[in-house]
Amino acid sequence: MSKNTAEIKKKILMIATGGTIASKKGADGLTPELTSEELLSFVPEVKEFCEPTCVQLMNIDSTNICADDWLKIENLIEKNYDLYDGFVICHGTDTMAYTAAVLSYLIQNSPKPIVITGSQKPIDMEVTDAKTNLSDSFRFCVSKFASGVQIVFDGKVIKGTRAKKTRSKSYNAFSSINYPYTAIIQDGRVMQYDKTRGRGKPKFYRKLDTKVGLFKLIPGANPLILERYFELHDAVIIESFGTGGIPSDGTSGITSGGTGDNFGFYPVIEKWQKKGKILVMCTQVVNEGSDMTVYKVGKNLKEKYGFLESYDMTPEAVLAKLMWLLAEKKRPSDVKRLFYKTVSEDILYTE
């Protein structure tokens, strides 16, 4: 390798946070133990095309991740942004889509790539997807059009606001929801589909509001549970059926205090909507999104109570966007106004 070639290698910061990729098997099951340096040692080939540096930010099972951890990741990237050409975050798969969505709002318009990856099998296993995923992440980072927050997994590059874990064990664990892949990586080659990239300087945000709840609707659900959600949160996402709606027939099988009095969802929603709570409707159906205008159970609700609607957004992105918006804009009117503003291709279809 010539001196000139070595001089133009891109500098990539690898941030290790734990997850399956760094886990070792013990008596109680898999636990993250490997360090960032140990992870990098399994993919020595990346040093041929970039200059990697490692940092161990945390070493946790991603099930345990929380808002404070997301802010630590943002802070580390912000402090090192001008020193590196890209970032690779090693992360557990279980909450990877949430982290990708949150970082997409905390770090906006980044002309540099911020890649999140992991694996379904630990990297020190004889048969594993970890080495390929980690190597592919570095390859994407140094590619010409790489930018923004992306998940790299099983040869697919997925925008951070569009990723969802759709398989619990298979190597092709993540899908891009209602949006095409950013790129495909095959045999070490990056085939870029999306050649747009952020211009100028990125915008960093340093706050999240965790008073956002997600209520998953089930047939015959107790409205009192939704009441409790509103008591604890400033914004509530209702993950409903199909295109979106709420049971409108009387009690939904529930009586208030055993008196036999009707206690349906509508009185609960009306009460808290008047108190300024943010209400968002999304769907449990993975693909094609919501449309509350289709059925009476959705249309009446939207017109009467001013529900926001996720449309083609993922629930992970809706949750992350509300956490970001509530931290920046305390007035419900501002949150509602900005909810439909596209950030990192999170939403394409609106009213």
PLM regions and their residue ranges:
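A glycine- and small-aliphatic-rich helix-loop capping segment at beta-alpha/alpha-beta transitions
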Residues: 28-37, 95, 101-113, 130-136, ...
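Accessory alpha-helical/coil subdomains and C-terminal extensions
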Residues: 6-11, 15-19, 23, 35-46, ...
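Short acidic, glycine/serine/threonine-rich loops at helix termini
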Residues: 24-28, 100-101, 126-129, 159-165, ...
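Short Gly/Thr/Asp-enriched flexible loops that form oxyanion-binding sites at enzyme active sites
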Residues: 90-112, 248-253, 261-268, 298
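Internal gly/pro-rich beta-alpha loop/helix module
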Residues: 116-186
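ATP/nucleoside-binding phosphotransfer catalytic cores, i.e., glycine-rich phosphate-binding loops
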Residues: 253-351
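Short, acidic/small-residue loops that bind anionic groups at enzyme active sites
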Residues: 100-131, 138-144, 272-283
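ATP/NTP phosphate-donor binding region
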Residues: 1-79, 287
